[in-house]
Amino acid sequence: MSSRTVLAPGNDRNSDTHGTLGSGRSSDKGPSWSSRSLGARCRNSIASCPEEQPHVGNYRLLRTIGKGNFAKVKLARHILTGREVAIKIIDKTQLNPSSLQKLFREVRIMKGLNHPNIVKLFEVIETEKTLYLVMEYASAGEVFDYLVSHGRMKEKEARAKFRQIVSAVHYCHQKNIVHRDLKAENLLLDAEANIKIADFGFSNEFTLGSKLDTFCGSPPYAAPELFQGKKYDGPEVDIWSLGVILYTLVSGSLPFDGHNLKELRERVLRGKYRVPFYMSTDCESILRRFLVLNPAKRCTLEQIMKDKWINIGYEGEELKPYTEPEEDFGDTKRIEVMVGMGYTREEIKESLTSQKYNEVTATYLLLGRKTEEGGDRGAPGLALARVRAPSDTTNGTSSSKGTSHSKGQRSSSSTYHRQRRHSDFCGPSPAPLHPKRSPTSTGEAELKEERLPGRKASCSTAGSGSRGLPPSSPMVSSAHNPNKAEIPERRKDSTSTPNNLPPSMMTRRNTYVCTERPGAERPSLLPNGKENSSGTPRVPPASPSSHSLAPPSGERSRLARGSTIRSTFHGGQVRDRRAGGGGGGGVQNGPPASPTLAHEAAPLPAGRPRPTTNLFTKLTSKLTRRVADEPERIGGPEVTSCHLPWDQTETAPRLLRFPWSVKLTSSRPPEALMAALRQATAAARCRCRQPQPFLLACLHGGAGGPEPLSHFEVEVCQLPRPGLRGVLFRRVAGTALAFRTLVTRISNDLEL
């Protein structure tokens, strides 16, 4: 057994010895695991894992869905319940004391969050060298990838998603928690397209009147006071980021963007952005309430909940603050199932009442997560299903059962587990269980094998899992003009191919950590906040050099993946004796031309400039220091009919209840579709392996060749309509342009 170490104040117990992780003392239940009848648990297991498959605790590891230099995220299946989860595996030996402190803070914060639109933490497992965070798996990937694949959203759909985001962020603020890294990459989607906010690695607790002074976040989403080096209360920086997110959902581009940090800083501090012609007046009005330069005049989320735009289509069901229901720890059905697994009623009660994030609590919570075939998901008022069937739902709940919650607060009479129905469609796969193996050795070994340099690990629990991988191209692109027809709306035709996507797509904002905070001089703006082409004072540069992060180009692309300028910053602490912030970086304004200019609030007062330092140079140099991509080696045997590296009991494709992300459909048998996909990917010169019966993991290019590296997955899924299958493409790493080209070629070869 691996030894367990103290994680943080709490009552966690590890999944093997039942030792208390949080308090550092052994539980009186310690020996019960070895003495418990393993046969009873094996016989009653809903799912199990073969001995040769890697596992961590009670979880069978399936595949990597995100990785970085110190951690990775694995898709896993809970052996006892068959539910899919995402496990973040962190190598503690690579972290300094400051990073460890932030990690423990992230865990502590996630333990206290219980909202249907926030990724749920199920279990914490810790060994001497490794920390495992077992979290909710959002199978539909990131909002970022959704926008890449579908283009901008119509306001009706953007409103449904944004209501969920506002509810979750307001819930965090009510608990005195500020996220500080809200962006499209950290907004995940479950199987029913409900929002799940992830990555609380930069979150912190705040107290009104006690200022925070750490500059962190993705620059295009960062509030102007962060660029100025000012201290802040906390919620106001999240509110600015929400405005950027809303603009991105509706327009498919960023309001503030550019080729380098200097341009980005100038654009943000000026507060100018273009309003596309298709944006409604009400949407423009709510944006003006978010994107206010003066944080004291920025709106509050309580005010936003009463805004006209956010409640259109929800008459009588105004968005209200989320009321957290009491945890249901007395579900006799789940307890009986767990007793059949071999747990005792005493340890179940102790774990649940003490809120220990151990295997007992995780099993109980996962048993309460409904499968796709039944039960509500999400809370009334915020689910996206309202976009598709408003007459059959109330306040956005996708099930007809939600009518009982009409015109009421979210989940006022439903339990937490009813709100968060699990997004896993996969059924159990019986096989012998081998619980005596070391529960963590395989995870630690894989972490060491696949560690990549130069990145902070993604905390994403999304299906695509591409955040942690370096992009194959360092090119930075700015936003296109949203007035142009090349920005597509999301297509309703599920059989259409990705050919309608623009040639250049969105740039992913990765996560970096900076040891110093960039300073900034305050901008000098006209009193009315308007641009003056002849005499508007420019923001003085923070450094003699601009450090361009993108090659010059006349055409700018929409939110392209892999930009260093859109990476998450984390600055050091600002000492009180410092006068202010300096240095900065800026962004070129998003759309270059539009008939309408957005308004902004009264500009910030001009401040006394102070000498700049070489901090900006250090910051930009750090961001532009790229590590050459090491293509992930896709191991395993060649795909043949006689050697398949999966459990043969999984003979049916995964069921997609909501096939909104499927581009290609066919009535062919799934086996025939897989054979056609293998031929098409081979014709496209892709290197593929088949980790699951109806899933291909593919690599193309890279390894010093002329073509950039592209890593993607192709899956054959069962659609709700009988006899109809869908082909689902998911990008894991690489540029959107290369991915789109490959998808188009493979789709054409399939001739569906």
UniProtKB/Swiss-Prot annotation:
One of its GO terms (molecular function) is cytoskeletal anchor activity. The modification Phosphothreonine is found at T214. The keyword rRNA-binding does not apply. Residues 1-36, 385-614 are annotated as: Disordered. Activated by phosphorylation on Thr-214. ATP binds at I65, G66, K67, G68, N69, F70, A71, K72, V73, K88. PROSITE patterns: KA1, PROTEIN_KINASE_ATP, PROTEIN_KINASE_DOM, PROTEIN_KINASE_ST, UBA. This is MAP/microtubule affinity-regulating kinase 4. It comes from Homo sapiens. The gene is MARK4.
